[in-house]
Amino acid sequence: FKQDVVDLMPTVVVILAGTNDIAGNTGPSNVKMITDNIFSMATIATANDIQVVLSSVLPVYKYEWSPEIVDPPSTIDAVNECLKEYAESNGLYYLDYFSKMVDNRKGLKKEFTPDGVHPNEKGYELMSGIAEKKLMSILDF
């Protein structure tokens, strides 16, 4: 985080993290571990006068490569709720991709993904529009 963000001295950082942890890509994890890691990044950024935008974890119904991961939507909901509360309590910004991209199963809408996890071009277009609007308001453009 130091070399990727702090050393570059940005005005704002958008943090979108957590899905790889939820999927088990980095080993076993839980909501507290995931959110503590994200909160640590936010604390480091804030200490370096970088405004922080915490982004919701994108919806995922199932990680096909990790069938042992049970009920990702519940974990994602819990992480997102913690992120939103933390942002509100600490004067940070919260960027809600989730509500614009979720389907009725609490997965990523098919129109936004090739595999149920990663956004496609249309998904990234939606996300960039949401992020741009938030950043413009933060930076007074």
Over which residues does each language-model region extend?
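Alpha-helical cap/lid subdomain in secreted, periplasmic
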Residues: F1-F141
